[in-house]
Amino acid sequence: SEAKKKKRDVSLDGVTNVDVPVPETDEEKEALVAKFLDGLRKLLSKENNWTFLQPLMLSLDNCVKCNTCSNACPIYNESGRIEAYRPLFRSDVLRRIVNKYLKPGGKLTAKFTGADIDLNWETVARLAQMSYRCTLCRRCAQTCPMGVDNGLLSREIRKLFSQEMGIAPQELHTDG
């Protein structure tokens, strides 16, 4: 409904699949971004994510942006090839955030390394939306010549939002 759309972020494509409330104050916006960055740090730490850290880092570091994954992705193809549904799109957003905000010197070198992205509540909300625009079928990983697993990246992003931020589709999170 229109009333629900005003209270929830639908900026990606006019549809919401994840219940991300629109922050009302600047403090709420900053808190959402800070919580996301804290969760991302945990996701990239050996202590908190030792089982998936190596494949996660390989997938973040080894993408050459050839877009081979796009042709294999059923969501991207069925969407009519909408850019936001491309497997590379969501992983590249995450990659740019990690490179700019979590790597040493990232903010200084962001413009030169392709990591120039503004991290605000809208970027966080769109990343949450994008993570559920993936079936986790991992066809992207099967076709990638570099072995990048965008399905794994989507799953790890979902894990961050669900476990660290309490943001997930209602059908999954509360309705089981």
Please place each PLM-identified region on the residue numbering:
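Iron-sulfur (Fe-S) cluster-binding modules
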Residues: 1-65, 70-71, 75, 99-101, ...
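Iron-sulfur-cluster electron-transfer modules
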Residues: 32-36, 50-60, 85, 95-176
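N-terminal cofactor/phosphate-binding cores enriched in small/glycine residues
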Residues: 79-93
